């Protein structure tokens, strides 16, 4: 950027100040209105790579997985007979929850006896028909009725058992129940209470189906607030509640972040006030404080022109770049207070500031090549923020009132130009590079999404407690995805048949066992009808005779005899819900919705399955969800993004060399960011802290400030002209520390990691820029 252009633009702004400010305010208003269109996306899907559709399918499938898509609440009491009180509390909690937040998952077991037996005709395959013929033999009917009498005279006849014995005197229900994948669908509920109760009667399980995705962080937080409020209201002092589920993970993150930000904002604002009051001492601080707000408005407004939906997590990480945008304004402020004319200041300070802007922008520009949408959004936000901050600093702020007052105290300054001492600089850079290489081989890099979560240890502990009482639901799940539920069921049957043939030892639970195809149902019904036409009258007569012989009325087995007489309609899925299997259907089959047009059918397997062994057409529509599979696949994709780091470094070094056109000066200016990296890696190696995604997100701020300071200080040393650079470096570093470095005190792992990286990066960067760089230079003409 040429000096005459900036000086000429400044002269125009100074001459047409009213018009210039009006244009700036109009532009700001337009971009602020555009920013109001922004729709923050709290979903984590933006961090899944574009070229990994399998990851997106896994993430969406997690929403329908029982282990993550449901919310499990374990209610516990030591009270004798306390299960009844727990059931009353659970009913009250369900009544308190708004229907648009969650609904209770009802009883999966204890289906209706008559309606369940009505499914038998649809399941009468060859094996069932053979058993049916054996069970209806004359002698076997007599034996079965006698056993029924014995059961009715025992304690087994209490409650629903009577209905089962009347509806199925011949013990045929096993051919229906054996098809139910109840071991995968959920815990069996108590027939009286309607909730699953542990064997000791001390635990009761309430299962909720949230109305929103677990990726919707704000909705998950509202749901958990409502659940905890309801538990506090309805649980007696001797009762305890334990909540486990993916929505709790999301809510804990949101709540911890909100608490951290609330606690740290006060100290950050206090730090800003102290820094400005002690080191700036100017009414121009008002303009400095407005720079981040202006830059953020321009950046957000510009991004909404590309897409109104922006990742909240990406913008949260990108907000750290606001500190670099303010850095330009701080340097301009102290340079203007040096006592020289504005034109001289602009000619002197604009080139290094512009070079610092280009160096930072080049690093973020490389990130635009990322395959992760959130990283590209972060890069674009950073580019727009840096551009707005630089433009404000060199064009608008120099003509703002009070911005250049009061003059700085005049100190004796060495204005003799200096040049880097080659041996000293090369020795320092070589040593730092070797140190960074050695430390990086020691530091553990952990880009796991788990490092972004709060309270993971407690959440895992609570999950183990739930498993100890109710067993594990960490099944291996296959998700068959199609456009319609009909296609999903058809492909699910094909997948189930193939797996039973390829992996006979892999236990499979699938809805297709109780939801036969139209052809299967018709063939089975034909067998049933042929049997009832031929044997029905005989069976009814033998049952009536045996009933009277053993002391029953002739109509005691009317539910079963009516089944033999009644015509059988075509199979209708409503028959499953009539039998009390609706919740099981909802667990396994998920119809398309307005938000997600994909139908999904779940198949549960006892062992991990390799879907690649299926036919290509089936394998393409089937996703395997083994425990930890999503995280493993995501880590593989994120590791591929590491290639962008050396590219960003090379881009920054190339621009530095193009600016200084001298290897010695380029290496000298690169010392502050190198020292920052070395200090961060040294701290991590000594403490055992890994380099996480959040730490990587904070790196651009530290390296951006360090690069800016290295360029500006090197420029001043080489030119011999100083315009308040030392104070500008200290102020910009301290404001960044108070604004972002205090995040090291946060409880959320991601925020804490960001704060620690910024803290240790800035600790060493300031003394290196202000003390070490001058020591590595010598006055021209003198020997090192």
Enumerate the language-model features and the residues they cover:
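Alpha-helical transmembrane helix bundles of large polytopic membrane transport and channel proteins
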Residues: 85-204, 505-585
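Extracytoplasmic
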Residues: 160-277, 282, 562-657
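Hydrophobic transmembrane alpha-helices and their membrane-interface caps
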Residues: 285-331, 665-713, 741, 771
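Pore- and gate-forming transmembrane helices of large, multi-pass membrane proteins
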Residues: 289, 340-370, 718-747, 766
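Transmembrane alpha-helices and their membrane-interface boundaries in multi-pass membrane transporters
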Residues: 305-306, 321-337, 350, 354-412, ...
């Amino acid at each position: 950027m040429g000096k005459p252009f900036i000086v000429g633009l400044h002269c125009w702004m100074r001459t047409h100040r009213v018009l210039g400010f009006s244009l700036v305010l109009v532009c700001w208003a337009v971009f602020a209105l555009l920013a109001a269109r922004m729709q923050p996306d709290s979903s984590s899907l933006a961090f899944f790579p574009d070229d990994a559709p399998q990851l997106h399918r896994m993430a969406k499938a997690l929403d329908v997985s029982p282990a993550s898509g449901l919310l499990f609440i374990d209610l516990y009491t030591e009270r004798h007979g306390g299960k009844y009180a727990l059931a009353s509390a659970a009913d009250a909690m369900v009544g308190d929850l708004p229907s648009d937040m969650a609904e209770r998952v009802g009883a999966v077991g204890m289906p209706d006896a008559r309606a369940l037996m009505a499914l038998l005709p649809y399941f009468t395959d060859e094996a069932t028909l053979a058993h049916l013929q054996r069970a209806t033999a004359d002698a076997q009917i007599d034996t079965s009725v006698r056993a029924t009498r014995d059961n009715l005279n025992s304690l087994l006849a209490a409650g629903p058992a009577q209905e089962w014995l009347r509806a199925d005197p011949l013990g045929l229900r096993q051919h229906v129940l054996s098809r139910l994948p109840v071991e995968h669908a959920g815990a069996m509920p108590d027939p009286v209470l309607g909730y699953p109760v542990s064997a000791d009667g001390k635990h009761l399980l309430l299962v909720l189906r949230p109305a929103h995705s677990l990726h919707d962080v704000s909705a998950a937080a509202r749901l958990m607030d409502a659940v905890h409020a309801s538990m506090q209201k309805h649980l007696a002092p001797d009762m305890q509640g334990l909540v486990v589920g993916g929505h709790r993970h999301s809510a804990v993150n949101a709540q911890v972040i909100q608490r951290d930000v609330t606690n740290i904002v006060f100290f950050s604002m206090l730090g800003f006030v102290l820094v400005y009051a002690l080191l700036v001492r100017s009414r121009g601080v008002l303009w400095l404080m407005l720079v981040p707000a202006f830059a953020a408005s321009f950046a957000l407004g510009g991004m909404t022109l590309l897409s109104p939906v922006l990742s909240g997590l990406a913008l949260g990480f990108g907000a750290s770049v606001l500190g670099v945008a303010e850095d330009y304004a701080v340097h301009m402020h102290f340079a203007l207070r040096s006592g020289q004319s504005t034109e001289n200041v602009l000619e002197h300070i604009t080139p290094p500031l512009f070079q610092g802007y280009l160096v930072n922008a080049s690093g973020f520009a490389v990130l635009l090549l990322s395959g992760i949408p959130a990283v590209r959004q972060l890069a674009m936000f950073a580019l727009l923020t840096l551009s707005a901050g630089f433009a404000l600093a060199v064009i608008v702020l120099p003509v703002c009132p009070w911005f250049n007052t009061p003059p700085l105290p005049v100190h004796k300054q060495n204005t003799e130009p200096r040049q880097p001492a080659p041996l000293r600089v090369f020795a320092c850079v070589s040593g730092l590079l070797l140190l960074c290489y050695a430390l990086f081989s020691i530091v553990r890099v952990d880009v796991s999404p788990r490092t972004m979560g709060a309270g993971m240890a407690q959440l895992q502990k609570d999950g183990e407690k739930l498993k100890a009482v109710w067993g594990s639901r960490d099944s291996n799940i296959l998700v068959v995805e199609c456009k319609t539920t009909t296609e999903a069921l058809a492909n699910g049957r094909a997948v189930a048949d193939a797996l039973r043939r390829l992996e006979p030892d892999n236990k499979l639970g699938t809805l297709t066992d109780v939801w036969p195809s139209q052809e299967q149902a018709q063939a089975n019904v034909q067998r049933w009808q042929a049997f009832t036409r031929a044997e029905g009258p005989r069976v009814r007569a033998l049952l009536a005779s045996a009933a009277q012989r053993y002391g029953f009325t002739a109509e005691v087995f009317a539910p079963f005899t009516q089944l033999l007489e009644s015509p059988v309609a075509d199979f209708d899925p409503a028959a499953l819900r009539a039998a009390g299997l609706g919740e099981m259907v909802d667990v396994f089959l998920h119809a398309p919705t307005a938000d997600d047009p994909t139908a999904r059918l779940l198949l549960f397997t006892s062992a991990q399955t390799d879907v690649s062994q299926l036919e290509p057409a089936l394998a393409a529509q089937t996703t395997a969800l083994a425990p930890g599979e999503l995280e493993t696949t995501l880590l593989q994709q994120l590791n591929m993004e590491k290639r962008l780091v050396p590219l960003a470094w090379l881009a920054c070094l190339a621009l530095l060399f193009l600016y200084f056109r001298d290897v010695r000066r380029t290496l000298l200016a690169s010392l502050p960011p190198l020292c920052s990296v070395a200090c961060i890696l040294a701290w991590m190696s000594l403490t055992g802290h890994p380099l996480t995604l959040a730490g990587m997100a904070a790196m651009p701020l530290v390296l951006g400030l360090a690069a800016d300071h290295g360029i500006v200080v090197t420029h001043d040393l080489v030119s011999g002209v100083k315009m308040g650079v030392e104070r500008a470096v200290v102020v910009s570093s301290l404001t960044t520390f108070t604004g972002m470095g205090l995040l090291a005190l946060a409880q959320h792992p991601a925020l804490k990691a960001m704060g620690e990286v910024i803290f240790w990066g800035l600790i060493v960067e300031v003394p290196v820029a202000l003390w070490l760089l001058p020591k590595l230079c010598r006055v021209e003409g003198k020997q090192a």
